[in-house]
Every structure is written in C-alpha cells, then in structure tokens.
C-alpha cells in the first residue's frame, strides 16, 4: 500500500533531519516542497499542508532545507503557552502535543483507504488531523475541550478557508448522534497512560450500543516508551483495552509526532474495528 511506504520514507527522513537539526526551537517538523518518488503526494494536498503551517500561530519561523536529497520546508514553533493552558482541564486527557502535519495527512489517508467516510478527531489540539481529513474530502469533526485551542482552530479555519468543523466540548459528554455518522473513523487523542484510556473506553461504550458498531474504526496513538508503559507493552500500550472491548487490529503504522522527534522509534497509530 502506497501510504505504508510514504510513512516509512517519512520516518527515515525524520531520522536524517534530527541528526542535522541545529536549531533551538521548542517544536520542529518538515513538509516536502513538492511531490517526488519518495513522497508521491498530490501537489494541491501538499500546498494545503504548507498552508496549515503558514497560517498556524504556533509556528514562528520556516526555512527550506534539503534532507537526504529531498527539498523540504522546515517549520519551527512553540507550543508552551497552549501546553500550559491545556493541562488545566480536569477531564482533559493529555497536554497539547501534536502529531506532525504530514503524519496527520498519512493517518487520515490510511483511514480513507479503508473506505471510511467521516473522521472524528477527539482531543484534536490544533485540528491538524481533522484539517487533513477535510482536504481528503472526508466529512470531518474536530472535538477539543480546551477553548484556547478551539480558538486557534478557528483562526486556522478562517485563514485557510478549510472548514474542518471544530467543536469546543467535552468528548465524554458529547452526543455523537448529532453528527449523523454512517461510516466513521474516530481518532483518540491521548496516550493510554495519560487518560486516553478513559476517553477511549467512553467512546467505545457509546458506539457499541448503536448501529454504528459494525461500521466504525477507532484509531489509537500508542507509545513504545518503557517509561510510560508499566503493565501493557503490546499494541503501543492499548492491548488490554483492545482485548476487553473485542476490537481487532486491522493496521498499525509508525509516524513521527512532536513527542518522538528525538527518539528512534516513532508513534504507532493502531487502527481497530469491532469484531
């Protein structure tokens, strides 16, 4: 599958970038400037990704750099103020630590390849996964409890004119029937040991009592960090929840995220369906 290879190429390029990165930014990521053999991505979609970064206030600088022969634009930014704000919510599952924009695009593309038609990002941060889903013509919804982050999403929406439907609400309280979903994929924003399991359990229980159960995919972001995983090493820390709720893993892909920039192993995204 094409996106498996693109994901592998991105992981490899990230390692090269990490070795050569001499900046001092709080966060940094790159997006290829144009389509290539390693990144055969629609040029218009690439442009939309650059637009997201250019119009997102968390990034304050960008420059072009060749990484392993591929011309990329590097975006540098700072999420400290958003991070500090995001930890004040009692039921918020995780501080704001986004995935990379290109990782968000690949993750949404994989969901689309399984013929899912709607994407709901739970704990969506600055909305990047929902934004990419909208670019890919999926019906997207971006659910975030933090009002400051939703304000940020609305700024991006206004500037890019891509409406990825940000909703400021507690995902645990939200009534998903309002979205009229038919074949949705839910992305759970939160690592299992940082409250993501509470969020996931709630969503799974809501879905499993409806007709959606047979047509739903749930995607978890995992971790391979031993420090964060006490009891549960497999499936990125999600295996006990996956087993408990009778889910089956249909795909796992590793993608760079802000929190794995300096690590050799990136973040596993685990795609599951109800059995």
Descriptions of predicted regions:
Residues 2-114, 152-181:
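S-adenosyl-L-methionine
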Residues 115-125:
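Conserved class I S-adenosyl-L-methionine
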Residues 126-138:
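Conserved SAM-binding loop of SAM-dependent methyltransferases across substrates and taxa
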Residues 129, 148-149:
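Conserved short alpha-helix immediately C-terminal to the canonical SAM/SAH-binding motif I
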Residues 139-144:
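Conserved SAM-binding motif I beta-strand of class I
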Residues 183-199:
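A short SAM/SAH-binding and catalytic strip from SAM-dependent methyltransferases
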């Amino acid at each position: 599958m094409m996106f498996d290879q693109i994901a592998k190429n991105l992981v490899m390029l990230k390692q090269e970038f990490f070795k050569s990165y001499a900046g001092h930014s709080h966060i940094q990521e790159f997006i290829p400037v144009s389509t290539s053999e390693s990144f055969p991505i629609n040029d218009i979609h690439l442009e939309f990704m650059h637009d997201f970064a250019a119009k997102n206030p968390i990034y304050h600088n960008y420059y072009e750099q060749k990484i392993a022969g591929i011309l990329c634009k590097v975006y540098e930014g700072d999420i400290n103020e958003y991070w500090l704000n995001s930890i004040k919510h009692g039921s918020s599952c995780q501080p704001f630590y986004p995935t990379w924009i290109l990782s968000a695009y690949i993750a949404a593309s994989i969901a689309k390849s399984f013929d899912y038609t709607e994407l709901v990002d739970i704990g969506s941060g600055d909305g990047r996964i929902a934004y990419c889903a909208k670019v890919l013509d999926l019906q997207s919804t971006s659910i975030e409890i933090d009002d400051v982050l939703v304000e940020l999403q609305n700024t991006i929406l206004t500037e890019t004119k891509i409406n990825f439907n940000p909703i400021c609400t507690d995902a645990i309280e939200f009534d998903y029937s309002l979205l009229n979903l038919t074949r949705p994929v839910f992305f759970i924003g939160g690592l299992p040991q940082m409250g993501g399991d509470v969020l996931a359990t709630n969503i799974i229980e809501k879905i499993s009592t409806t007709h959606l159960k047979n047509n739903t995919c749930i995607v978890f972001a995992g971790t391979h960090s031993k420090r964060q995983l006490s009891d549960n090493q497999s499936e990125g820390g999600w295996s006990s929840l996956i087993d408990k709720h009778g889910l089956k893993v249909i795909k796992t892909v590793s993608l760079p995220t802000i929190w794995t920039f300096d690590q050799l192993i990136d973040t596993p995204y685990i795609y599951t369906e109800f059995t």
